[in-house]
């Protein structure tokens, strides 16, 4: 009790001394700031740069959920990258391309280090202008893409790529054989892939194609369908055919730049449930969920948000799926990303303050200049 009283009185005395000190409360402090604003602005600018360019990325893991799938069961780790859409040379400036590439690279490297994935799945729209690019432009975009995501550091069977409408056409541009073959040349044409009790099957809703695989799944295996465009988003004939033939346990898709969970029927292709995935109050409001194997004729589809800040979305993230291969339980989490636009606006605000201070100082300097009066002397 005595120690608490001494601590309380000591803190009170310190704050009283601090805020009644002449330097802090007198006009001399404000006068010093008024006469030397650039010292203050330099300190604030340095702190702003350190936060925006280093701390915002270095401390990302502190805000991410703990990734786990049990202590005693083997775990397969998958990292999903949706709609990176590296900017093109037609619509964007060199600075915009450089800043967006840098953002994608830094956030991806932190996410990869945190998730330690066995497999990385790129869910399409790898390039923003891939469908419109000439051969020379495409080669430059490809080199940038490989550098951003450090593709040379991965094993060939560690990455899976899906084409999006911005890669081969399909939404605003026509799909051509040249575009499709160019994509296959650089990113592969494998349509199904197996890894440790997990089967990945690629579905292309734009080309309306999917591989011919046995309907009967292997015992204790999970079947994942990967599609750039959601299959349960807008029900149609193709979705019905694909779901009825493939009978997946889970669908992972992108394209909408949103984080959504859908539930549908594999026989009819119709959606029966929709839920935004932003935070989970049962997991301490962290973006983390647990999905169990679906019941018969039911499928879960998870739409993964974009990882680029240039896609018009305020919610960017990478996604992870930690799969318990013995119980077939999926621990799904979102690795949310900082708002780069907010960082850029903070720079704009800071430079605006600097400009206003310069104007005020200039006007103040003019006001302090001595006024010279001329007196006319008569000569008699």
Stretches with model-predicted labels:
Residues 58-70, 131-219, 273-300, 320:
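Extended active-site neighborhood of metal-dependent phosphoesterases/phosphodiesterases
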């Amino acid at each position: 009790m005595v120690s608490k009283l001494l601590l309380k009185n000591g803190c009170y005395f310190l704050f009283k001394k601090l805020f009644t000190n002449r330097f802090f409360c007198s006009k001399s402090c404000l006068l010093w700031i008024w006469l030397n604003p650039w010292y203050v602005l330099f300190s604030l600018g340095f702190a702003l740069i350190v936060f925006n360019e280093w701390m915002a990325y270095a401390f990302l893991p502190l805000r991410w959920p703990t990734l786990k799938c049990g202590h005693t069961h083997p775990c397969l780790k998958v990292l999903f990258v949706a709609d990176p859409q590296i900017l093109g040379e037609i619509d964007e400036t060199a600075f915009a391309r450089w800043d967006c590439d840098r953002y994608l690279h830094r956030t991806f490297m932190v996410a990869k280090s945190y998730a330690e994935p066995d497999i990385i799945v790129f869910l399409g729209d790898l390039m923003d202008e891939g469908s419109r690019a000439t051969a020379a432009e495409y080669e430059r975009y490809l080199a940038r893409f490989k550098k951003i995501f450090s593709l040379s550091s991965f094993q060939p069977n560690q990455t899976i790529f899906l084409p999006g409408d911005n890669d081969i056409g399909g939404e605003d541009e026509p799909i051509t054989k040249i575009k499709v073959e160019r994509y296959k040349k650089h990113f592969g044409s494998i349509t199904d892939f197996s890894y440790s009790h997990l089967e990945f099957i690629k579905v292309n809703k734009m080309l309306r194609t999917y591989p011919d695989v046995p309907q009967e799944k292997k015992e204790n295996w999970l079947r994942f369908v990967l599609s750039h465009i959601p299959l349960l988003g807008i029900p149609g004939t193709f979705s019905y055919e694909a779901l009825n033939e493939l009978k997946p346990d889970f669908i992972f898709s992108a394209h909408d730049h949103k984080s959504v969970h859908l539930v549908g029927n594999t026989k009819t292709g119709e959606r029966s449930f929709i839920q935004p995935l932003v935070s989970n109050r049962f997991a301490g409001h962290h973006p983390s969920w647990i999905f169990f194997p679906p019941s018969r004729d039911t499928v879960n589809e998870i739409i993964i948000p974009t990882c680029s800040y240039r896609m018009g979305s305020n919610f960017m993230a990478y996604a992870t799926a930690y799969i318990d291969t013995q119980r077939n339980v999926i621990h799904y989490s979102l690795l949310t990303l900082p708002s780069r636009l907010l960082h850029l606006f903070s720079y704009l605000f800071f430079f605006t303050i600097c400009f206003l201070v310069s104007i005020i100082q200039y006007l103040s300097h003019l006001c302090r200049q001595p006024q010279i009066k001329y007196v006319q002397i008569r000569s008699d």
